[in-house]
Amino acid sequence: MSAEVALVYRVLPESVEVDIEKLKTSVINKLSPKYKVDRVEVEEIGFGIKALRFFIRMPESDEYSSDEVEELLRSVEGVGGYELEYFSRLSF
């Protein structure tokens, strides 16, 4: 069995007006089925602003990359910014 890579991205909406649940669904739909979204957390930042934290797994392979994940995130309407918080190789 090959190793996998775990990524955690924090995604911020463009504005307070962005529906956080719709943004969450849009990001999941954009990443799937190629990238596995294990979990999504909603983080209250303040002043009505919320961030999303996506826990993503992908095979350790040249066909998958964090650069591609970031391209996909940039292409989602409503995404104002993102940050890679965690990157680790998983092996079982």
From Swiss-Prot:
Disulfide bonds: none
Xref: InterPro entries: eEF-1beta-like_sf, EF1B_bsu/dsu_GNE, Transl_elong_EF1B/ribsomal_bS6, Transl_elong_EF1B_B_arc
CDD domains: EF1B
GO molecular function: translation elongation factor activity
One Pfam family hit: EF1_GNE
Source organism, top-level taxon: Archaea
SUPFAM superfamilies in the record: eEF-1beta-like
Keywords: Elongation factor, Protein biosynthesis
NCBIfam families linked to this entry: PRK00435.1 (NF001670)
UniProt function note: Promotes the exchange of GDP for GTP in EF-1-alpha/GDP, thus allowing the regeneration of EF-1-alpha/GTP that could then be used to form the ternary complex EF-1-alpha/GTP/AAtRNA.
Family stated for the protein in its record: Belongs to the EF-1-beta/EF-1-delta family.
Name the record gives this protein: Elongation factor 1-beta
Originating gene: ef1b
